[in-house]
Regions:
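Hydrophobic alpha-helical connector segments
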Residues: 53, 67-93, 147-151
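Basic, helix-initiating cap at the start of DNA-binding domains
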Residues: 1-19, 24-35, 49
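Amphipathic alpha-helical packing segments from all-alpha helical-bundle domains
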Residues: 60-63, 67, 93, 111-136, ...
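C-terminal peripheral helix-coil segments that are non-catalytic and often amphipathic
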Residues: 89, 124-132, 154, 165-187
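Short coil/turn segments at alpha/beta junctions that flank glycine-rich nucleotide-binding fingerprints
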Residues: 18-22, 73, 94, 136-137
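Alpha-helical DNA-contacting segments of helix-turn-helix folds
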Residues: 52-58
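Short hydrophobic/aromatic patch on the recognition helix
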Residues: 34-44
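Amphipathic alpha-helical segments used for helix-helix packing
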Residues: 86, 90-110, 160-164
């Protein structure tokens, strides 16, 4: 991604998180980035395309981080622990992006449905790990969809925790608390 596109990406992410999708205009984005509309339209055909790009990049970031980390682990419990830590770290580093993903998850518009589709794909990856853990006896029998959704829900929990604590978050302390609760429930 070139410098201008990255700046549009980062600025849009911040504006969408602060103002919401509907209240953010192309003019807001171009004024904040400091580029002409033509420059923005060279990189993105519409506000909707910018939003879709943000969602896709955000989910890719989560999936790639998890794929890299979990591919090196043999234990399915360790894979779940890695997912928990990655999700907390991503909330801390990319709070605006997570705010957008969570806020746009609800609704029936095309952008909401695309967001839901990407999030469901991510949750399905978690569910595959849970199913495999059940098959080998590392994880007790249970509703794999519910378990995977709960693990994804840690993103929301971490964000709420961060906001309630004025942005202060001890990653490892929060990880230990989430990990303890989740892993106890899986064994």
């Amino acid at each position: 991604m070139n410098k201008t596109k990255r700046k549009i990406f980062e600025t849009s992410m911040k504006l969408f998180a602060e103002k919401g999708y509907d209240a953010t205009s192309i003019e807001d984005i171009t004024a904040t980035v400091g580029v002409a509309k033509g420059t923005l339209y060279y990189h993105f055909s519409s506000k909707e395309e910018i939003f879709n790009f943000l969602v896709e990049e955000g989910i890719k970031l989560l999936q790639n981080s998890i794929d890299i980390k979990t591919s090196k682990l043999e234990s399915y419990i360790d894979k779940i622990k890695a997912i928990i830590l990655i999700e907390i770290k991503i909330v801390v580093k990319y709070e605006d992006l997570i705010t957008i993903l969570l806020s746009q998850f609800w609704g029936k518009e095309a952008r909401n449905q695309k967001c839901q589709k990407h999030i469901y794909e991510y949750i399905n990856k978690i569910e595959e790990i849970v199913k495999s853990g059940i098959e080998v006896g590392e994880i007790k029998q249970g509703n794999t969809k519910a378990i995977a959704s709960e693990i994804y829900g840690l993103i929301c929990s971490a964000l709420i925790f961060k906001l309630r604590n004025n942005g202060e978050i001890d990653i490892m302390k929060l990880y230990k608390e989430f990990e303890s609760t989740i892993i106890k429930g899986l064994k």
